[in-house]
UniProtKB/Swiss-Prot annotation:
This is Altronate oxidoreductase. One of its GO terms (biological process) is mannitol catabolic process. The gene is uxaB. Gene3D superfamilies: N-(1-d-carboxylethyl)-l-norvaline Dehydrogenase, domain 2, NAD(P)-binding Rossmann-like Domain. Keywords: NAD, Oxidoreductase. One of its GO terms (molecular function) is mannitol-1-phosphate 5-dehydrogenase activity. It comes from Escherichia coli O17:K52:H18 (strain UMN026 / ExPEC).
Length: 483
Protein backbone atom coordinates (compact mmCIF):
# COMPACT_ATOMS: atom_id res chain seq x y z
CA UNK A 1 0.00 0.00 0.00
CA UNK A 2 1.41 3.40 -1.00
CA UNK A 3 2.11 6.09 1.59
CA UNK A 4 0.86 9.59 0.82
CA UNK A 5 3.28 11.86 -1.08
CA UNK A 6 2.91 14.45 -3.83
CA UNK A 7 4.59 12.32 -6.53
CA UNK A 8 2.15 9.42 -6.25
CA UNK A 9 -0.81 11.64 -5.36
CA UNK A 10 -0.40 14.71 -7.60
CA UNK A 11 -2.74 17.68 -7.21
CA UNK A 12 -2.95 21.35 -6.38
CA UNK A 13 -0.09 23.08 -4.57
CA UNK A 14 -0.44 26.63 -3.28
CA UNK A 15 2.03 29.50 -2.76
CA UNK A 16 3.09 29.92 0.86
CA UNK A 17 1.06 32.70 2.51
CA UNK A 18 0.36 31.24 5.97
CA UNK A 19 2.69 30.46 8.87
CA UNK A 20 1.30 28.08 11.47
CA UNK A 21 2.89 27.55 14.88
CA UNK A 22 1.85 24.06 15.98
CA UNK A 23 1.71 20.73 14.15
CA UNK A 24 -0.97 19.06 16.29
CA UNK A 25 -4.23 17.34 15.41
CA UNK A 26 -6.43 20.30 16.32
CA UNK A 27 -5.06 22.83 13.83
CA UNK A 28 -4.85 20.20 11.09
CA UNK A 29 -8.55 19.27 11.42
CA UNK A 30 -9.66 22.85 12.04
CA UNK A 31 -7.61 25.65 10.42
CA UNK A 32 -5.84 23.67 7.67
CA UNK A 33 -9.08 21.86 6.80
CA UNK A 34 -10.88 25.21 6.39
CA UNK A 35 -8.00 26.69 4.34
CA UNK A 36 -8.15 23.60 2.11
CA UNK A 37 -11.87 24.14 1.45
CA UNK A 38 -11.30 27.84 0.70
CA UNK A 39 -8.41 26.98 -1.65
CA UNK A 40 -10.65 24.56 -3.54
CA UNK A 41 -13.72 26.78 -3.81
CA UNK A 42 -12.21 30.30 -4.05
CA UNK A 43 -9.08 32.09 -5.22
CA UNK A 44 -7.61 32.22 -1.68
CA UNK A 45 -4.63 30.32 -3.14
CA UNK A 46 -2.74 30.02 0.15
CA UNK A 47 -0.32 27.34 1.29
CA UNK A 48 0.65 26.72 4.91
CA UNK A 49 4.12 26.29 6.39
CA UNK A 50 3.86 24.48 9.71
CA UNK A 51 6.44 25.52 12.30
CA UNK A 52 7.03 22.96 15.02
CA UNK A 53 7.49 25.24 18.02
CA UNK A 54 8.93 22.72 20.50
CA UNK A 55 12.00 20.49 20.43
CA UNK A 56 10.66 17.01 19.79
CA UNK A 57 10.95 14.39 17.08
CA UNK A 58 7.56 12.81 17.80
CA UNK A 59 5.33 12.70 15.89
CA UNK A 60 7.53 12.63 12.77
CA UNK A 61 7.46 15.66 10.48
CA UNK A 62 4.49 16.12 8.16
CA UNK A 63 7.12 16.74 5.46
CA UNK A 64 7.64 12.95 5.33
CA UNK A 65 4.29 12.94 3.45
CA UNK A 66 5.02 16.22 1.58
CA UNK A 67 2.49 17.96 3.83
CA UNK A 68 -0.37 15.69 2.70
CA UNK A 69 -2.74 14.01 5.16
CA UNK A 70 -6.39 12.96 5.44
CA UNK A 71 -9.12 14.32 7.66
CA UNK A 72 -12.11 12.15 8.50
CA UNK A 73 -14.98 14.36 9.61
CA UNK A 74 -17.82 12.40 11.15
CA UNK A 75 -20.89 12.89 13.24
CA UNK A 76 -24.49 13.93 12.77
CA UNK A 77 -25.16 16.47 10.04
CA UNK A 78 -27.76 19.25 10.16
CA UNK A 79 -30.50 16.70 9.35
CA UNK A 80 -29.43 14.38 12.16
CA UNK A 81 -27.98 11.78 9.76
CA UNK A 82 -24.69 10.03 10.56
CA UNK A 83 -22.06 11.09 8.03
CA UNK A 84 -18.37 10.32 7.59
CA UNK A 85 -16.40 12.36 5.07
CA UNK A 86 -12.75 11.68 4.17
CA UNK A 87 -10.79 14.55 2.60
CA UNK A 88 -7.21 14.64 1.36
CA UNK A 89 -5.79 17.93 2.69
CA UNK A 90 -3.41 19.74 0.31
CA UNK A 91 -3.18 23.12 2.05
CA UNK A 92 0.02 22.32 4.01
CA UNK A 93 3.21 22.53 1.93
CA UNK A 94 5.83 21.54 4.49
CA UNK A 95 6.80 21.47 8.14
CA UNK A 96 9.95 23.01 9.59
CA UNK A 97 11.47 22.71 13.05
CA UNK A 98 12.36 26.03 14.64
CA UNK A 99 15.11 24.20 16.58
CA UNK A 100 16.93 22.38 13.78
CA UNK A 101 16.07 24.82 10.94
CA UNK A 102 16.29 28.23 12.61
CA UNK A 103 17.61 30.09 9.53
CA UNK A 104 14.82 28.58 7.44
CA UNK A 105 12.38 29.79 10.11
CA UNK A 106 13.66 33.39 9.92
CA UNK A 107 13.56 33.22 6.11
CA UNK A 108 9.75 32.85 6.28
CA UNK A 109 9.68 36.57 7.17
CA UNK A 110 11.44 37.46 3.88
CA UNK A 111 8.60 36.10 1.71
CA UNK A 112 6.56 39.14 0.57
CA UNK A 113 3.46 36.93 0.10
CA UNK A 114 3.26 35.85 3.77
CA UNK A 115 0.09 37.27 5.29
CA UNK A 116 -1.38 35.14 8.10
CA UNK A 117 -0.03 33.58 11.28
CA UNK A 118 -2.14 30.93 13.05
CA UNK A 119 -1.11 29.16 16.24
CA UNK A 120 -2.08 26.57 18.78
CA UNK A 121 0.74 26.10 21.26
CA UNK A 122 -1.57 24.84 24.09
CA UNK A 123 -3.05 27.00 26.86
CA UNK A 124 0.43 27.35 28.39
CA UNK A 125 1.93 28.51 25.08
CA UNK A 126 0.95 32.17 25.30
CA UNK A 127 3.05 32.94 28.32
CA UNK A 128 6.15 34.87 29.34
CA UNK A 129 9.44 33.05 29.74
CA UNK A 130 12.02 35.03 31.70
CA UNK A 131 15.43 34.90 30.12
CA UNK A 132 14.34 34.70 26.46
CA UNK A 133 16.87 36.78 24.48
CA UNK A 134 16.75 38.33 21.01
CA UNK A 135 19.81 36.33 19.94
CA UNK A 136 18.50 32.96 21.17
CA UNK A 137 18.19 30.57 18.25
CA UNK A 138 15.38 30.02 19.11
CA UNK A 139 13.89 31.63 22.23
CA UNK A 140 11.88 29.27 24.44
CA UNK A 141 8.40 30.86 24.47
CA UNK A 142 6.10 31.15 21.46
CA UNK A 143 5.54 34.94 21.95
CA UNK A 144 9.33 35.49 21.96
CA UNK A 145 9.77 33.41 18.77
CA UNK A 146 6.99 35.43 17.13
CA UNK A 147 8.54 38.75 18.24
CA UNK A 148 11.86 37.74 16.65
CA UNK A 149 10.10 36.70 13.41
CA UNK A 150 8.11 39.96 13.28
CA UNK A 151 11.31 41.97 13.77
CA UNK A 152 12.93 40.01 10.94
CA UNK A 153 9.99 41.00 8.71
CA UNK A 154 10.11 44.64 9.81
CA UNK A 155 13.86 44.85 9.10
CA UNK A 156 13.77 42.99 5.79
CA UNK A 157 11.02 45.22 4.36
CA UNK A 158 12.24 48.45 6.02
CA UNK A 159 9.07 48.84 8.06
CA UNK A 160 6.72 48.78 5.03
CA UNK A 161 3.15 49.17 6.30
CA UNK A 162 1.76 46.76 3.67
CA UNK A 163 3.97 43.91 4.92
CA UNK A 164 2.33 43.41 8.32
CA UNK A 165 0.57 40.21 9.33
CA UNK A 166 -2.84 39.13 10.52
CA UNK A 167 -2.13 37.05 13.61
CA UNK A 168 -4.86 34.62 14.66
CA UNK A 169 -4.05 32.53 17.76
CA UNK A 170 -6.32 29.55 18.54
CA UNK A 171 -5.08 28.80 22.08
CA UNK A 172 -7.90 28.26 24.60
CA UNK A 173 -7.42 31.35 26.75
CA UNK A 174 -9.65 34.42 27.05
CA UNK A 175 -8.85 37.18 24.55
CA UNK A 176 -5.88 35.20 23.22
CA UNK A 177 -5.03 37.88 20.61
CA UNK A 178 -4.73 40.63 23.23
CA UNK A 179 -2.65 38.36 25.48
CA UNK A 180 -0.26 37.49 22.62
CA UNK A 181 0.07 41.14 21.53
CA UNK A 182 0.92 42.26 25.07
CA UNK A 183 3.67 39.65 25.33
CA UNK A 184 5.14 40.58 21.93
CA UNK A 185 5.25 44.23 23.04
CA UNK A 186 6.83 43.18 26.34
CA UNK A 187 9.64 41.33 24.56
CA UNK A 188 10.11 44.22 22.10
CA UNK A 189 10.62 46.61 25.03
CA UNK A 190 12.73 44.18 27.04
CA UNK A 191 15.02 43.60 24.06
CA UNK A 192 15.20 47.38 23.48
CA UNK A 193 14.02 47.05 19.87
CA UNK A 194 13.59 50.38 18.05
CA UNK A 195 10.52 52.53 18.66
CA UNK A 196 9.81 52.41 14.90
CA UNK A 197 9.31 48.63 15.21
CA UNK A 198 6.83 49.06 18.07
CA UNK A 199 4.88 51.58 15.97
CA UNK A 200 4.95 49.18 12.99
CA UNK A 201 3.63 46.37 15.22
CA UNK A 202 0.63 48.57 16.03
CA UNK A 203 -0.01 50.09 12.63
CA UNK A 204 0.72 47.23 10.23
CA UNK A 205 -0.36 44.12 12.18
CA UNK A 206 -3.65 42.81 13.56
CA UNK A 207 -3.75 40.51 16.60
CA UNK A 208 -7.17 38.84 16.53
CA UNK A 209 -8.74 37.12 19.54
CA UNK A 210 -10.68 33.95 18.75
CA UNK A 211 -13.07 31.33 19.99
CA UNK A 212 -12.52 27.90 18.45
CA UNK A 213 -14.95 25.02 18.76
CA UNK A 214 -14.60 21.52 17.36
CA UNK A 215 -13.96 18.19 19.06
CA UNK A 216 -10.91 16.73 17.32
CA UNK A 217 -10.43 13.07 18.18
CA UNK A 218 -7.11 12.80 16.35
CA UNK A 219 -5.40 9.66 15.06
CA UNK A 220 -7.93 6.80 15.05
CA UNK A 221 -5.56 4.16 16.44
CA UNK A 222 -8.20 1.40 16.79
CA UNK A 223 -9.58 1.81 13.26
CA UNK A 224 -6.49 2.62 11.21
CA UNK A 225 -6.33 -0.68 9.28
CA UNK A 226 -9.99 -0.49 8.27
CA UNK A 227 -9.83 3.20 7.32
CA UNK A 228 -6.62 2.83 5.28
CA UNK A 229 -8.19 -0.13 3.48
CA UNK A 230 -11.12 2.13 2.50
CA UNK A 231 -8.82 5.01 1.49
CA UNK A 232 -6.43 2.79 -0.48
CA UNK A 233 -3.25 4.32 0.94
CA UNK A 234 -1.20 4.53 4.14
CA UNK A 235 -1.42 7.79 6.09
CA UNK A 236 0.58 8.22 9.31
CA UNK A 237 -1.19 11.54 9.99
CA UNK A 238 -4.86 10.55 9.72
CA UNK A 239 -6.93 13.02 11.74
CA UNK A 240 -10.54 12.55 12.87
CA UNK A 241 -12.96 15.21 14.10
CA UNK A 242 -16.65 15.85 14.65
CA UNK A 243 -18.92 17.32 11.95
CA UNK A 244 -19.57 20.57 13.86
CA UNK A 245 -17.07 23.42 13.86
CA UNK A 246 -17.22 27.12 14.72
CA UNK A 247 -14.52 29.77 14.37
CA UNK A 248 -15.27 33.20 15.88
CA UNK A 249 -12.64 35.84 15.11
CA UNK A 250 -12.58 39.28 16.69
CA UNK A 251 -10.99 41.30 13.92
CA UNK A 252 -11.41 43.85 11.14
CA UNK A 253 -14.45 43.39 8.87
CA UNK A 254 -12.07 43.30 5.88
CA UNK A 255 -10.88 39.90 7.13
CA UNK A 256 -13.98 38.21 5.67
CA UNK A 257 -12.98 39.35 2.18
CA UNK A 258 -9.31 38.59 2.69
CA UNK A 259 -10.11 35.02 3.71
CA UNK A 260 -12.62 34.82 0.80
CA UNK A 261 -15.45 33.98 3.20
CA UNK A 262 -17.69 36.17 1.02
CA UNK A 263 -17.14 33.67 -1.82
CA UNK A 264 -17.50 30.42 0.12
CA UNK A 265 -19.19 30.81 3.49
CA UNK A 266 -17.84 28.62 6.28
CA UNK A 267 -19.01 28.61 9.91
CA UNK A 268 -16.63 31.51 10.60
CA UNK A 269 -17.89 34.69 12.24
CA UNK A 270 -15.92 37.96 12.13
CA UNK A 271 -17.16 39.95 15.13
CA UNK A 272 -16.41 43.07 17.20
CA UNK A 273 -16.29 41.14 20.49
CA UNK A 274 -15.98 37.41 21.12
CA UNK A 275 -17.27 37.70 24.69
CA UNK A 276 -20.98 36.86 24.08
CA UNK A 277 -19.97 33.86 21.94
CA UNK A 278 -17.66 32.63 24.67
CA UNK A 279 -20.48 33.02 27.22
CA UNK A 280 -22.86 31.16 24.90
CA UNK A 281 -20.46 28.23 24.56
CA UNK A 282 -19.72 28.05 28.30
CA UNK A 283 -23.40 28.34 29.25
CA UNK A 284 -24.96 26.05 26.63
CA UNK A 285 -22.32 23.50 25.59
CA UNK A 286 -20.28 23.26 28.80
CA UNK A 287 -23.28 24.04 31.03
CA UNK A 288 -25.38 21.28 29.50
CA UNK A 289 -22.48 18.82 29.96
CA UNK A 290 -22.14 19.80 33.61
CA UNK A 291 -25.88 19.52 34.31
CA UNK A 292 -26.10 16.21 32.45
CA UNK A 293 -23.20 14.31 34.01
CA UNK A 294 -24.28 13.73 37.64
CA UNK A 295 -27.91 13.12 36.63
CA UNK A 296 -27.17 10.67 33.80
CA UNK A 297 -24.39 8.81 35.61
CA UNK A 298 -26.49 8.21 38.72
CA UNK A 299 -29.36 7.13 36.46
CA UNK A 300 -27.12 4.24 35.38
CA UNK A 301 -25.65 5.60 32.13
CA UNK A 302 -21.95 5.83 31.23
CA UNK A 303 -21.54 7.99 28.11
CA UNK A 304 -22.96 11.24 26.76
CA UNK A 305 -24.33 9.36 23.73
CA UNK A 306 -26.25 6.90 25.95
CA UNK A 307 -27.66 9.81 27.92
CA UNK A 308 -28.91 11.57 24.77
CA UNK A 309 -30.53 8.34 23.55
CA UNK A 310 -32.39 8.02 26.86
CA UNK A 311 -35.73 9.80 26.38
CA UNK A 312 -36.04 11.06 29.97
CA UNK A 313 -32.47 12.25 30.48
CA UNK A 314 -32.44 13.87 27.04
CA UNK A 315 -35.68 15.74 27.85
CA UNK A 316 -34.19 16.93 31.15
CA UNK A 317 -31.12 18.37 29.38
CA UNK A 318 -33.06 19.96 26.52
CA UNK A 319 -35.53 21.62 28.90
CA UNK A 320 -32.64 22.90 31.01
CA UNK A 321 -31.09 24.46 27.89
CA UNK A 322 -34.22 25.93 26.28
CA UNK A 323 -36.23 26.90 29.37
CA UNK A 324 -33.55 27.86 31.90
CA UNK A 325 -30.23 28.68 30.19
CA UNK A 326 -31.15 30.41 26.90
CA UNK A 327 -33.68 32.90 28.39
CA UNK A 328 -30.97 34.57 30.52
CA UNK A 329 -28.26 34.85 27.83
CA UNK A 330 -27.46 38.04 25.96
CA UNK A 331 -27.60 37.13 22.25
CA UNK A 332 -30.52 36.92 19.78
CA UNK A 333 -32.76 33.98 20.72
CA UNK A 334 -32.70 32.40 17.23
CA UNK A 335 -28.87 32.37 17.26
CA UNK A 336 -28.87 30.73 20.68
CA UNK A 337 -31.44 28.14 19.63
CA UNK A 338 -29.56 27.14 16.49
CA UNK A 339 -26.36 26.81 18.54
CA UNK A 340 -28.24 24.71 21.13
CA UNK A 341 -29.65 22.48 18.42
CA UNK A 342 -26.12 21.89 17.09
CA UNK A 343 -24.95 21.12 20.65
CA UNK A 344 -27.53 18.38 21.24
CA UNK A 345 -26.62 16.90 17.85
CA UNK A 346 -22.96 16.89 18.89
CA UNK A 347 -23.83 15.12 22.13
CA UNK A 348 -25.51 12.38 20.06
CA UNK A 349 -22.48 11.83 17.81
CA UNK A 350 -22.24 8.02 17.45
CA UNK A 351 -18.53 8.27 16.56
CA UNK A 352 -17.49 9.78 19.89
CA UNK A 353 -17.66 7.79 23.13
CA UNK A 354 -17.51 10.55 25.72
CA UNK A 355 -17.31 8.99 29.19
CA UNK A 356 -19.44 10.79 31.78
CA UNK A 357 -16.85 10.14 34.50
CA UNK A 358 -14.13 11.90 32.49
CA UNK A 359 -16.31 15.02 32.13
CA UNK A 360 -17.09 14.85 35.87
CA UNK A 361 -13.52 15.96 36.65
CA UNK A 362 -13.51 19.10 38.88
CA UNK A 363 -17.30 19.23 38.88
CA UNK A 364 -17.56 21.74 41.72
CA UNK A 365 -15.59 24.41 39.85
CA UNK A 366 -17.39 23.60 36.60
CA UNK A 367 -20.76 24.12 38.30
CA UNK A 368 -19.64 27.51 39.64
CA UNK A 369 -18.38 28.80 36.28
CA UNK A 370 -20.82 27.15 33.87
CA UNK A 371 -24.21 26.84 35.60
CA UNK A 372 -24.34 29.05 38.68
CA UNK A 373 -24.43 32.35 36.68
CA UNK A 374 -27.56 31.17 34.80
CA UNK A 375 -29.15 29.74 37.97
CA UNK A 376 -28.75 33.09 39.77
CA UNK A 377 -29.81 35.14 36.72
CA UNK A 378 -32.97 33.03 36.39
CA UNK A 379 -33.78 33.48 40.07
CA UNK A 380 -33.28 37.23 39.74
CA UNK A 381 -35.37 37.55 36.57
CA UNK A 382 -38.31 35.38 37.67
CA UNK A 383 -38.19 35.42 41.45
CA UNK A 384 -38.15 31.61 41.40
CA UNK A 385 -35.28 29.14 41.18
CA UNK A 386 -34.83 27.36 37.83
CA UNK A 387 -35.95 23.83 38.72
CA UNK A 388 -33.55 21.81 36.56
CA UNK A 389 -30.38 23.79 37.25
CA UNK A 390 -31.17 23.60 40.97
CA UNK A 391 -31.81 19.85 40.66
CA UNK A 392 -28.44 19.51 38.88
CA UNK A 393 -26.78 21.00 41.97
CA UNK A 394 -28.50 18.43 44.20
CA UNK A 395 -27.43 15.67 41.78
CA UNK A 396 -23.85 16.97 41.91
CA UNK A 397 -23.78 16.86 45.72
CA UNK A 398 -25.19 13.30 45.58
CA UNK A 399 -22.54 12.35 43.00
CA UNK A 400 -19.78 13.03 45.55
CA UNK A 401 -20.95 10.05 47.63
CA UNK A 402 -18.88 8.05 45.14
CA UNK A 403 -21.29 5.11 45.05
CA UNK A 404 -23.74 3.86 42.41
CA UNK A 405 -25.91 0.78 42.95
CA UNK A 406 -23.63 -0.45 45.72
CA UNK A 407 -20.46 -0.04 43.64
CA UNK A 408 -17.88 2.70 44.20
CA UNK A 409 -16.53 4.88 41.39
CA UNK A 410 -13.61 7.34 41.28
CA UNK A 411 -14.47 10.98 41.99
CA UNK A 412 -11.87 13.48 40.76
CA UNK A 413 -11.74 16.96 42.25
CA UNK A 414 -9.36 19.02 44.36
CA UNK A 415 -8.33 17.57 47.72
CA UNK A 416 -10.41 20.09 49.66
CA UNK A 417 -13.72 18.93 48.17
CA UNK A 418 -12.87 15.23 48.27
CA UNK A 419 -12.07 15.42 52.00
CA UNK A 420 -15.02 17.71 52.70
CA UNK A 421 -17.54 15.43 51.01
CA UNK A 422 -16.09 12.30 52.56
CA UNK A 423 -16.56 13.86 55.98
CA UNK A 424 -20.05 15.27 55.25
CA UNK A 425 -21.47 12.08 53.72
CA UNK A 426 -20.00 10.01 56.53
CA UNK A 427 -21.69 12.31 59.10
CA UNK A 428 -24.93 12.12 57.10
CA UNK A 429 -24.84 8.30 57.06
CA UNK A 430 -24.26 8.29 60.82
CA UNK A 431 -27.18 10.76 61.22
CA UNK A 432 -24.93 13.35 62.83
CA UNK A 433 -26.20 15.88 60.28
CA UNK A 434 -29.37 15.98 58.18
CA UNK A 435 -29.66 16.66 54.45
CA UNK A 436 -30.50 20.35 54.87
CA UNK A 437 -27.50 20.90 57.11
CA UNK A 438 -25.21 19.09 54.66
CA UNK A 439 -26.46 21.27 51.79
CA UNK A 440 -26.10 24.46 53.87
CA UNK A 441 -22.47 23.62 54.71
CA UNK A 442 -21.64 23.07 51.01
CA UNK A 443 -23.43 26.24 49.86
CA UNK A 444 -21.84 28.39 52.58
CA UNK A 445 -18.30 27.82 51.24
CA UNK A 446 -17.54 31.42 50.24
CA UNK A 447 -14.00 30.66 49.11
CA UNK A 448 -15.37 28.32 46.48
CA UNK A 449 -18.61 29.98 45.36
CA UNK A 450 -17.20 33.52 45.69
CA UNK A 451 -20.36 34.35 47.68
CA UNK A 452 -22.53 32.80 50.39
CA UNK A 453 -25.15 30.80 48.49
CA UNK A 454 -27.16 30.14 51.66
CA UNK A 455 -28.33 33.76 51.23
CA UNK A 456 -30.08 32.98 47.92
CA UNK A 457 -33.79 32.77 48.85
CA UNK A 458 -35.02 29.17 48.95
CA UNK A 459 -31.87 27.61 47.48
CA UNK A 460 -30.82 25.53 50.51
CA UNK A 461 -34.38 24.23 50.97
CA UNK A 462 -34.94 23.32 47.32
CA UNK A 463 -31.55 21.62 46.89
CA UNK A 464 -32.12 19.68 50.15
CA UNK A 465 -35.61 18.59 49.01
CA UNK A 466 -34.26 17.40 45.66
CA UNK A 467 -31.37 15.63 47.37
CA UNK A 468 -33.72 13.83 49.77
CA UNK A 469 -35.81 12.54 46.85
CA UNK A 470 -32.64 11.36 45.05
CA UNK A 471 -31.50 9.51 48.20
CA UNK A 472 -34.91 7.95 48.90
CA UNK A 473 -36.16 7.06 45.41
CA UNK A 474 -33.04 6.99 43.26
CA UNK A 475 -32.11 9.32 40.40
CA UNK A 476 -34.56 7.94 37.82
CA UNK A 477 -37.62 8.55 40.00
CA UNK A 478 -36.30 11.88 41.27
CA UNK A 479 -35.62 13.40 37.85
CA UNK A 480 -38.81 12.15 36.13
CA UNK A 481 -41.05 15.14 37.03
CA UNK A 482 -38.49 17.46 35.36
CA UNK A 483 -38.32 15.53 32.08
Amino acid sequence: MKTLNRRDFPGAQYPERIIQFGEGNFLRAFVDWQIDLLNEHTDLNSGVVVVRPIETSFPPSLSTQDGLYTTIIRGLNEKGEAVSDARLIRSVNREISVYSEYDEFLKLAHNPEMRFVFSNTTEAGISYHAGDKFDDAPAVSYPAKLTRLLFERFSHFNGALDKGWIIIPCELIDYNGDALRELVLRYAQEWALPEAFIQWLDQANSFCSTLVDRIVTGYPRDEVAKLEEELGYHDGFLDTAEHFYLFVIQGPKSLATELRLDKYPLNVLIVDDIKPYKERKVAILNGAHTALVPVAFQAGLDTVGEAMNDAEICAFVEKAIYEEIIPVLDLPRDELESFASAVTGRFRNPYIKHQLLSIALNGMTKFRTRILPQLLAGQKANGTLPARLTFALAALIAFYRGERNGETYPVQDDAHWLERYQQLWSQHRDRVIGTQELVAIVLAEKDHWEQDLTQVPGLVEQVANDLDVILEKGMREAVRPLC
